[in-house]
Amino acid sequence: MIPDIPESNNWLYSINMDTDVWIWNQDHGYMIWNLYAASGGHLAGRKIISCEVMTNTAGVFKTSLEEIKRHDDMNFITGINHTVLHGYNYSPAETDFPGWIRFGAYFSEQNTWWPYFRKWTDYNARLSYIFQNSSPVKNIAILSPTGDV
């Protein structure tokens, strides 16, 4: 079975968040799954390769817009061209601050970088459009198992 839209996931949390290992895991730890999703999707002729992003991060209200952009860039260079935001929670207006929040970067007007969020979404949309309307070229193959799997 081949999905209409292959999807990966960025699970970014690490038990080593207070060490240099966290920096490596944050950028590379699960990107192998993006490559698998993208490669399979491209072999099947799919134009859209999706990824649920910012699934689990340093914690609610602890993820900067700079980190979000950096992870987004890593997704694009590993073949992802469609972003699904994790953590865009619905919270009723009458709910006390900060609202109903659980996991992920928490995309909401309650976040301090919310006034600047449109700049990132515009950037993401432009790159998504370009990559969805271009032809992927890969000069390498990834053979399992790898250290990440």
Residue ranges and their predicted role:
Residues 1-6, 11-149:
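Carbohydrate-binding surfaces of carbohydrate-active enzymes
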